[in-house]
Amino acid sequence: MRFWFFGILFTWGIGLFGQLSTTGDVQLRWGESKNHFNYTETLLNLNANWGRTFSWLQFEFSDPPELGKRISGLRKIRIEYRGERTQIEVGDLYKIWGRGLILNQLDDQAIDLDNGLTGVGFTYQTKRFQGQIIAGNQDIYKSTNLVLGFNDRIPNYTMHHSLFGVDLLKHFPSSSLGYSFLQSRERHPIPFNQYYQPDTLPLVHRLQSLRIEMIKSRFDTYLEYVTKTTHESYQSVDFFGTGFTRK
């Protein structure tokens, strides 16, 4: 993937034209047991900023990790530009809208959960208003004994999502009103179709939420209402007998 290569060049290159500030940290994890549950993990985080431009890179070297797939190289990358009212992000994004009822993205390696988004994000913010737009792809890895190749440490199937979402938030003196829309086009794996073969089911999920928060001197109140619809996305059909089946 060429994107990470250009990200590294960008991080190094901005140091040639101005003052570059960098920080970093390293996490080392190692374990052994008599039942052969062994793991070795190394995580390296690099952060750089130059004026209004920020970048984050994470490298992982695991052989094997405690949970998840083996990785040796660049794992995450994000480049941001933060203006006075706007923010543009490209790369691996993690967002929380409201209290996380409709969108709550995190990377928790302790349980091998990563539901972040690889794509772009745009934010416009003033004192009274904030709007966010996100778009990109999301791969969620899971394990199940209903699919071939089950392993309690390594995921054996993947759910692919193509996401698009909008979040609007209006601030008032002692309250705020927000609206969120999130659409996911998912390729959901199923163990067996009508021909007893592994297959993928195309689904479209649409979520909408309306939330209100009130902050008073003696109490705080937060209410959110969410609706969700899911339907199958038929890309083509084949006539078969007296009916038809998805192709």
Please provide the spans of the model-predicted regions:
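Positively charged n-region of N-terminal signal peptides that target proteins for export
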Residues: 1-5
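Phosphate/ribose-recognition catalytic cores of enzymes acting on nucleotide-derived substrates
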Residues: 76
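Surface-exposed extracellular loop regions of Gram-negative outer-membrane beta-barrel proteins
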Residues: 94-105
